[in-house]
């Protein structure tokens, strides 16, 4: 990660490389048309671009960590985005632009090697659980996926606020992070999702 001085101030900003999906209808259309002929062409001319930008901002809340991916998977949902075949059904549950990548094994800022549970549930968003004993993503209406102190997003990798594993850094809530045993390789851990 580069540290870059911006403007005339002494403010230092972390810059990172990331693959980002932008909401550009024409690029999605081109990717969809090209993907049956050339998946490389779909990726090259579609909505995915390599950017150098600031790392995600930490929410003003407890329990958040910066993580640096060691290995990130490429899921079918990621491929459908790159190839222009993603359903628009979930558009309200996503915040553009976003960095894909929700199958992640990473180094956490507290020294742990962790795997990411990608759901951006109640705990991540600073919202109360809907009932006692609820899991992080439980709920009956899923309105929490657009609430709290994060932008809309079903999970990490589809939310502008958190970033995703296709970048050199992202943020994750403690409720999403699970320590990886030493006996488990990164290649095994990335499949945990």
Task: List each model region and its residues.
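Alpha-helix-centered segments that form part of catalytic cores
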Residues: 140-178
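Short N-terminal strand-loop motif that marks the start
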Residues: 2-100, 168
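Hydrophobic residues at beta-strand termini and immediately following loops
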Residues: 53, 170-172, 180, 192
């Amino acid at each position: 990660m580069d540290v870059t001085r911006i403007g005339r101030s002494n403010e230092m900003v972390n810059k990172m490389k990331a693959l980002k999906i932008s909401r550009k209808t024409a690029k999605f259309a081109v990717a969809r048309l090209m993907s049956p002929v050339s998946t490389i062409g779909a990726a090259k001319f579609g909505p995915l671009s390599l950017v150098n930008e600031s790392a995600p901002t930490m929410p003003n809340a407890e329990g958040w960590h910066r993580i640096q991916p060691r290995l990130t998977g490429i899921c079918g949902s990621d491929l459908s985005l790159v190839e222009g075949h993603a359903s628009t059904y979930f558009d309200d549950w996503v915040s553009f632009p976003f960095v894909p990548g929700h199958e992640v094994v990473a180094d956490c800022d507290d020294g742990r090697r962790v795997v990411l549970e990608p759901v951006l549930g109640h705990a991540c968003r600073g919202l109360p659980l809907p009932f006692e004993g609820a899991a992080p993503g439980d709920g009956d209406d899923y309105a929490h996926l657009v609430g709290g102190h994060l932008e809309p997003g079903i999970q990490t990798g589809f939310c502008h606020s958190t970033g995703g594993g296709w970048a050199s850094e992202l943020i994750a809530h403690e409720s999403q992070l699970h320590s990886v045993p030493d006996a488990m390789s990164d290649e095994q851990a990335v499949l945990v999702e």
